């Protein structure tokens, strides 16, 4: 037989090069079970729809629409309480100047002549004198005319001054001035008083945070919940800081918090009342997909169990298991069994989170679609082990802008066994620094996310003399959502663009390479087709709403567009392998594909995603799409990826 004539030397040579590591890379992946791909459209609506935002009730009091009532002749506003806040740009002189300008405007002093009458008043009196023909001679005025003239002058005098409604408008305008300076709880009030000599007293409640009280909390301690606002006590209440505090609390596992303000015990103080709702302490996700590798089985099923806040300190424990194999042989030893443990807890406050994780993946490689593949002769099996500790810190947390950074230390190892001695096992220790930022814009309806990572690794096992003992890797991921108007309609489509780029000038371990194909790459190809040390991927998804004529109610008040999405997809990628062998060239490949994608989800119960993509172009240094052997021709049909997730 032909198979029997293959020498062990040729097999060993075949598995020792970078091409082999690229082909079986997916079996060496160390990062554990992948989480759900973030739905940018859902994230955009969660941030922009008011009902989904952490509640902070801070409504500016509306004007009391009562009758004007009697008018008051106001000579001056004085402040019974006015504290200066230079850091907010508020000083007594400026506030008093604004109050005086408002008093003068509402008193209409600029319209009053030296006689004490306005032009309108004088014109009204002149019209009456002309009517009774007394313009030139007051002797023509009868007693009745004089009485009427006197009544008119009394009425004019009574209408001068400031009404109750005017005073309310003045205090509201002063309140808006304070809030424009960031004191969003400040109020200018008129205390009960008797007006003497036209002087009206005003008082300012600036909105100093006096205390934080908590209600309805069960597992979370009051001390932990107050932590988000600890530095704001006895300080001016800032909308930005209050919003950030609520978001930091709502980032904690199983916690939902809203807030509202109450009057404080001391003048100018306010109390923040936190109303707590705690969700279930655990959740479970079961997922089935065909995103796996040919050599460990395309079909995968995984289950993740998360225990939220077990200690009452905002921690989370996640235990996961994944099994990959083929549908025909799901009970044999071919494929992989992966277990994952992850625990995280806040440290040094709510902004910083410590995480420890471990991944153990036992696998056996085989190519069941091609029995003559040398992979089957080698009987390769092995274990991946990953240990990591990390610190993640949130510098800014809000609805519109977020910024964070993380530092990690990792230990990643792959052990391999085969019927012959092979040296493709890897053991790397290193660290990485990651930076994340996202920004929401409602004016142009966009959501942009960016992640940048610098990674260092040092080989713990012996490597080829021509190969460096350590490496650096730079990675950049971007994710953007843009709403695009459709011509001749009022509808908007949703365009999502994703970039994934990584660079290294060294030959990387297989588990650090970036795969060009697969469900997270060019979806017209398999995850095993090519992986690179240097690579770039672009994915574009263009989603459209269903026409209103078929946007029917499906069930439970949900309309079709709320649970179903469809769109066009296009992917392209380029990657290369850094060769360290003498007189060798770097292998490279370029792939592209296009197709359709469909998504169906129902609240937090289940989610289904399906993509159908056809190869459009493929080229490589090894003739992946040369004139002699076209990978597109070999593919014959579109690649289909599907995943089903159920949430409990």
Regions found by a protein language model. Give the residues of each.
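Immediate N-terminus of the mature polypeptide
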Residues: 2-536, 542-648
């Amino acid at each position: 037989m032909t198979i029997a004539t293959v020498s062990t030397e040729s097999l060993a040579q075949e598995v020792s090069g970078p091409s082999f590591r690229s082909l079986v890379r997916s079996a060496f992946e160390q990062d554990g079970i992948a989480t759900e791909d973030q739905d940018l459209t859902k994230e955009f609506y969660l941030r922009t729809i008011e009902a989904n935002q952490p509640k902070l009730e801070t409504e500016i009091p509306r004007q009391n629409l009562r009758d004007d009532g009697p008018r008051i002749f106001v000579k001056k506003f004085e402040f019974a309480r006015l504290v200066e806040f230079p850091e907010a740009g508020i000083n007594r002189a400026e506030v008093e100047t604004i109050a005086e300008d408002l008093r003068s405007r509402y008193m209409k002093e600029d319209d009053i002549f030296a006689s004490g009458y306005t032009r309108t008043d004088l014109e009204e009196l002149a019209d009456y004198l002309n009517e009774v023909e007394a313009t030139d001679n007051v002797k023509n005025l009868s007693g009745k005319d004089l009485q009427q003239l006197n009544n008119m002058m009394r009425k004019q005098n009574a209408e001068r001054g400031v009404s109750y409604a005017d005073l309310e408008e003045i205090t509201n305008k002063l309140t808006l001035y304070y809030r424009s300076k960031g004191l969003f709880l400040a109020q200018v009030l008129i205390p009960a008083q008797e007006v003497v000599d036209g002087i009206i007293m005003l008082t300012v409640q600036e909105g100093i945070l006096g205390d934080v009280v908590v209600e309805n909390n069960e597992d979370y301690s009051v001390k932990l919940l107050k932590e988000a606002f600890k530095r704001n006590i006895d300080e001016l209440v800032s909308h930005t800081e209050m919003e950030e505090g609520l978001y930091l609390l709502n980032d904690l596992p199983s916690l939902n918090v809203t807030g509202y303000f109450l009057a404080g015990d001391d003048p100018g103080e306010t109390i923040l009342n936190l109303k707590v709702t705690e969700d279930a302490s655990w959740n479970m996700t079961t997922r089935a997909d065909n995103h796996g590798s040919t050599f460990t089985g395309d079909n995968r099923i995984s289950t993740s169990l998360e225990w939220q806040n077990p200690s009452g300190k905002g921690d989370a424990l996640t235990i996961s298991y994944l099994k990959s194999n083929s549908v025909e042989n799901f009970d044999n030893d071919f494929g992989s069994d992966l277990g994952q443990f992850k625990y995280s807890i806040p440290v040094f406050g709510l902004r910083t989170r410590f995480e420890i994780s471990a991944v153990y993946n036992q696998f056996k490689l085989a190519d069941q679609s091609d029995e003559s593949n040398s992979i089957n002769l080698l009987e390769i099996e092995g274990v991946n082990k990953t240990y990591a500790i990390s610190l993640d810190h949130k510098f800014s947390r809000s609805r519109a802008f977020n910024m964070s950074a993380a530092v990690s230390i990792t230990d990643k190892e792959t052990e391999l066994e085969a019927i012959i001695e092979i040296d493709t096992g890897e053991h790397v220790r290193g660290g990485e620094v990651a930076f994340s930022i996202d920004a929401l814009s409602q004016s142009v309806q966009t959501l942009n996310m960016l992640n940048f990572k610098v990674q260092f690794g040092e080989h713990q096992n012996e490597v080829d003399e021509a190969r460096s003992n350590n490496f650096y890797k730079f990675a950049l991921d971007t994710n953007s959502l843009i709403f695009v108007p459709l011509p001749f309609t009022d509808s908007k489509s949703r365009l999502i663009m994703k970039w994934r780029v990584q660079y290294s000038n060294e030959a990387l371990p297989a588990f650090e390479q970036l795969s060009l194909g697969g469900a997270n790459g060019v979806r017209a190809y398999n995850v095993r087709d090519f992986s690179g040390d240097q690579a770039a991927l672009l994915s574009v998804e263009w989603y459209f709403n269903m026409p209103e004529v078929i946007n029917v109610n499906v069930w439970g008040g949900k309309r079709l567009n709320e649970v179903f999405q469809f769109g066009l997809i296009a992917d392209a990628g380029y990657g290369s392998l850094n060769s360290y062998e003498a007189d060798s060239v770097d292998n490279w490949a370029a792939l592209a594909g296009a197709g359709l994608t469909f998504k169906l989800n129902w609240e937090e119960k289940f989610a289904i995603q399906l993509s159908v993509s056809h190869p459009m172009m493929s080229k490589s240094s090894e003739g992946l799409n040369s004139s002699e052997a076209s990978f597109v021709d070999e593919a014959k049909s579109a690649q289909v990826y599907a995943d089903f997730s159920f949430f409990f």
